[in-house]
Swiss-Prot record:
Highest taxon in the source lineage: Bacteria
Annotated binding of 3-dehydroquinate, by residue: E47, F48, R49, R83, R213, S232, Q236
Active site residues according to the UniProt entry: H144 (proton donor/acceptor), K171 (schiff-base intermediate with substrate)
Protein name as annotated: 3-dehydroquinate dehydratase
Keyword Amino-acid biosynthesis: yes
Length: 254
């Protein structure tokens, strides 16, 4: 039975699927403009994709920009994500820098949720999860497959592995090569929901997988990602259109 997670009065893992909007900006000026553009959009969680920053190699600058996001949206749950190149992100970096950055963000207590890549070394991942939770920050463990959709059993196994590492939220994103692959992801989501004790987040990327971003409440995915001003992953739907569609699916349509 999945337990829910409450972050700034937002309940993750129960009720309607929550909408996260990624913040994608290269510098302070663009970040300020994007924050102004998204502030009135109908989203539940803001995800700061710090790997898109030109200054992503400076921990101090990343902290400064994260503070800007926190100050601009004080009442929204803040998910900090630094996606590395190997998992589809914009910034290639060493494990040492990656975990040093995560530790700095955790110690700052600026984010409410922190994204940690599952396959970054089990010991380091477990330490980061424990450190986050010690500082009152939820740990979201994640994995991304940008070239394929693993079999259902493997998807479920990876989500279970995240939970075993102590994750508060378990997330996987896969790339479909066919409509059947989308069904595989949805079936895995349903199975994982039955087994998981923590909220799960799943998506099939690209245009083919877009339906998975709308079906979370039915199959068990707790968060869906919708674009504000710029997509951070293939197949993201605009936040306003995503909210309208989710409302329609929940309430029924004439």
């Amino acid at each position: 039975m999945c337990s829910c997670l409450v972050v700034k009065n937002t309940v993750i893992g129960s009720g309607r699927t929550k909408i996260a909007v990624p913040l994608v900006a290269r510098d302070a000026a663009v970040l300020s403009a994007v924050l102004d553009q998204i502030k009135n959009l109908p989203f539940d969680i803001v995800e700061f994709r710090a790997d898109f920053l030109e200054c992503a190699g400076s921990i101090g600058e990343v902290l400064r920009h994260t503070q800007t996001v926190r100050d601009a949206l004080p009442d929204k749950p803040l998910l900090f994500t630094f996606r590395r190149h190997g998992e589809g992100g914009s910034f290639p970096c060493s494990d040492d820098y990656y975990f040093e950055l995560l530790d700095a963000l955790i110690e700052s207590r600026l984010p409410d949720i922190i994204d940690i890549e599952l396959f970054s070394g089990e010991t380091a991942v477990r330490c980061a999860v424990a450190n986050a939770q010690k500082n009152g920050i939820a740990a979201l463990l994640c994995n991304h497959e940008f070239h394929r959709t693993p079999p259902q059993e493997e998807i479920v196994c990876r989500l279970k592995q995240m939970e075993d590492c102590g994750a508060d939220i378990c997330k996987i994103a896969v790339m479909p090569q066919s409509a059947e692959d989308v069904l595989t992801l949805l079936s895995a989501t349903l199975k994982a929901k039955e087994l998981a004790a923590k909220p799960i987040v799943t998506m099939s990327m690209g245009q083919t997988g877009a339906v998975s971003r709308l079906a979370g409440q039915v199959f068990g995915s707790s968060i869906t990602f919708g674009s504000g001003t710029q997509n951070s992953a293939p197949g993201q739907i605009g936040v306003s259109a995503l909210r309208a569609t989710l409302d329609c699916l929940e309430n029924g349509a004439d």
